[in-house]
């Protein structure tokens, strides 16, 4: 609960855990929990998250930390790599590549003998920008072609037809990019919680 409050600054861990249970009880599937490991804060909880995946039969996805919300990108931002997460989990569990085919960024693993899964979203140690087909919709209505985009298109008030045209245009723009990794060319003053999937 202490780390939860340090990271989120709002809400209660117990409420989140009840929400996860409610989603499972309602038959929503798959239930996926995203977590960003922050060195010195919650990086000792990797196995706790793996245990959660096993105990609840859900997917826990580890996302490498990216510079957001005013992080100073002129300094190296520490993160926990995909390799470290795998090494730690394999101390307790056997992981089997899940072989799921999707347009998502995660590398998925089944925890052998359980319904639990682990996903790795390794934007820093194994960039996947050249494979990304996702757009992002911010909480204030801007459609972004990329997670690290500084500018987007305001779609609030547009008709469905206009939004469809904007989406098609952004996908054409993405297809023409020769982008190997996120640039994070300027410090984000936007919280990741305000950027949708």
Give residue spans per PLM region.
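Radical SAM/AdoMet-radical enzyme domain recognition
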Residues: 1-63
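Auxiliary Fe-S-binding modules of radical SAM enzymes
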Residues: 47-55, 65-197
């Amino acid at each position: 609960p202490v780390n939860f409050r340090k990271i989120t600054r709002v809400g209660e861990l117990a409420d989140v855990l009840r929400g996860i249970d409610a989603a499972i009880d309602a038959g929503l599937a798959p239930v996926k929990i995203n977590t960003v490991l922050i060195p010195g804060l919650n990086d000792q909880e990797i196995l706790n998250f793996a245990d959660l995946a096993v105990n609840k039969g859900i997917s826990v996805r580890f996302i490498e930390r990216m510079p957001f919300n005013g992080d100073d990108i002129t300094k190296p931002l520490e993160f926990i790599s995909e390799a470290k997460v795998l090494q730690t989990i394999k101390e307790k569990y056997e992981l089997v590549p899940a072989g799921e085919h999707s347009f998502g960024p995660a590398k998925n693993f089944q925890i052998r003998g359980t319904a639990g899964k682990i996903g790795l979203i390794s934007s820093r140690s194994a960039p996947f920008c050249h494979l990304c087909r996702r757009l992002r919709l911010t909480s204030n209505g801007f459609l972004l072609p990329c997670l690290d985009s500084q500018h987007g298109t305001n779609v609030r008030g547009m008709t469905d037809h206009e939004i469809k045209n904007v989406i098609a245009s952004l996908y054409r723009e993405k297809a023409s990019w020769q982008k190997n990794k996120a640039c994070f060319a300027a410090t984000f003053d936007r919280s990741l919680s305000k950027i949708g999937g």
